[in-house]
């Protein structure tokens, strides 16, 4: 609380409003950073949007999302910790707070925070001629001002609300704690609607703010009432009566910068509330840490003073540094609210630069947080894109991507995979590159040299594919085709095109998903030219949406145009930063192109979801190429035993330990480690026999220049005689399963040449 010796308002009392200067109306010129209003510390301010027609094509309107159902829980002992973000983030539980402890002992506004509510210029400051006046008339515009509380403890407002005192001061004056005498002394908060100097504005504000009473969401502070009370001059002053939310604001909670995972967890709880507002045609407009309260059970949006109807005009309230730059031109939109979410996340986690008391637009290029969490960086970039059409289209879409980013962040921080199902991509359809490192040992079996090259066709057949857009008119008939064979899919689409299927009167010519499914089937069949033509025709009709860009990148990969494929997969990733599919595609493309980028993308996918087996084997290959063979073995050891590729991973790790190294680089420990991995697998497993031969043969070569203990490996003494017996036995076992007579003879001859000389 504030002490009499320090009249500056504390952060602890900023729960309902910003602790900065008062809310200020501003003209269009006030958006310039050199204007007087923006030279003040950050606080909720107003900009004026005139009523004019904006024809630049910027998308506006409501986005319907589902509201959360309120859940009533039985009384129970609460854990000192609670979880956010789908259980991925744990935070301390905020204890319940006695409302009276929030009262300010000395409700005084510091001189540095006194500004005229009308023109935004400093008022009430000390001068050489005398002390500062807490009320008077602005010397610049003549408007009356007062920084004294208009309500005193004991006042009864509307014959119902007993004022207990001030708890904060914000843009529209003092915020008061009161007890509702009609409802068992329930604590409530009273806040002025507009400045009290304009009676006509008071009446208009009372009428305009009535719509807030219709807002009902568990993540938004409740509006109980709208009342009037005469000030000392006899003028009616309107107040909004709100639920008292005890707890801590995010501004108080953060202190230093928050961990990224914690900040994302908070935003995931707030986004459904924003989505609800958008669904009923409202914009919040003033999201910032000060306006988010952490209570014992949940997070809540407080301070609805800036809420307005979507696309409205007139005075629009917001905070410079958080407010979208285009709001004067477009009015409040879903996109302007999304911008504030991005800026709030940035303020919570990054060291943002400030100028003249407000955050500078954009993101710091050298912040280590952005270097550590690439997907988080991409998400912030999209959320605050200067072009509102490129931002997330809804709170629901941003929430989905934010959850994906959270899984990556938590996996990075803890080293524990955090897999989850995507809402826009299918799971991987199969695997690629799993057998590459062990394939060359197949020469023992059939005498044929096997390629270790990854192919684009193999990758494309395995990559996830975009899920069908459920809003598309052709979606119902495509649900069953998602995992169909390409030829079958083309037959279905051909039948639909010729009316052989019942489409219930729907004009399938309007569908985007039907031709897109045809493109996918053609690419799976390798008909890149035809798929590309159809894709370009579709793009000419509907534009390059992200699903189209994905398949364009796939076609470029198949055409070996890896630079273009990388560019377009990156475009998809920038649009959907929480998805693993574009990261897996970028890793595979980089491996095909022979660049070094595959390691970081394979690593991100594998560390987040160890069910994406292709990423694990890809990461191991990349680590081997980089000379990090021990790391590659560790990666292969992370393949879960429940995977059908577990045996291949064990065999590949054995090969990785020994291959690609000179005899001088191999140690006895490498050989014994490889032998233990093979020995743990039954001989009936494919490739076990040939890897046994490889391990024993490598040990025999190594022993020619080195010495080792004679302890057995794979059942044979670690001696020249013992290893020769082992190699001979392995070669004869392989000869018995050789597919051709000639290779069988070759293996027998090789076994005879290795066989130790008999002594009698």
Curated annotation (Swiss-Prot):
Coiled coil: none annotated. One of its GO terms (biological process) is regulation of metabolic process. InterPro entries: Kinase-like_dom_sf, PknG_rubred, PknG_TPR, Prot_kinase_dom, Ser/Thr_kinase_AS, TPR-like_helical_dom_sf. Its EC number is 2.7.11.1. Residues 161-403 form the Protein kinase domain. PROSITE patterns: PROTEIN_KINASE_DOM, PROTEIN_KINASE_ST. ATP binds at residues 167-175, 191. Pfam families: Pkinase, PknG_rubred, PknG_TPR. Belongs to the protein kinase superfamily. Ser/Thr protein kinase family. This is Serine/threonine-protein kinase PknG. The gene is pknG.
